[in-house]
């Protein structure tokens, strides 16, 4: 007796591998990440463990693929490091034809923010100021101008667009909040008012809050920063940028050139460079309460005279140590990377 067709079909289905099984069979093996130089790993661990504060350190070889660090999987406040992701989003928008670097942008008093905003002088002097997308990006990166950054963010689609780019490009453990006004107000325990953008109004409003409330919100931010990022995610993003995996060749080159002209943090990562080495970077500096600072960072790409590059991130979550000690830490991280490079490649440029 011939079996019913449905029974034969069922038998075939039973014998066929499931879609999940096929996926497992078809999935290529993930190549293990190359081992980082042991001496460098030991040096970074010594630097991190010896620092009086909560610090994360990460280094990744752009060319070799290895990475190493100290407490580099934790989330640290980005502060103005997040401007890098606004710039990345802007250049992505350029690549997709949504904006042009030459597009004019007009800022008014309603665009002003707080803290560091050099562009505010031009706005206040005339009531408005017209510039370009590119000049906003340059000011946001090289001067860490909060007003330029927030305006650029809105021009390219707002905080949601920055978060979309981070997610679509699979950049990892990186959070992005709603711009400098919202970020700094929330840390302080305030709801943003545009009146805070003028003079010392923000400081007065912040100082009027109960210290117990300010301390509670400040510590909550440090423990779970809503603009947090892990140093490993940062260096992986920087390495991918340098390799041309995130933007077009022209946009990659332009962004790295702008980052190479950063004027802030001249004695952070930059202070550890040896002759012939270059740095493209972005700093971040957070609010201080009771002598404790929430966020003191520098992230960037250092490039050797032979062209090999390393992504580096030093992110201090919480510390009250003197600035010179923090800068020395960053200097020493860079020197450790350069020393391992020279030990491996000096006199053997074919490797």
Q: Where are each of the predicted segments found?
A:
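Bacterial N-terminal signal peptides
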Residues: 8-18
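Active-site-proximal helix/loop microenvironment
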Residues: 77, 173-250
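Structured C-terminal helix/loop/strand segments within mature extracytoplasmic catalytic/sensor domains
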Residues: 24-47, 154, 159, 219, ...
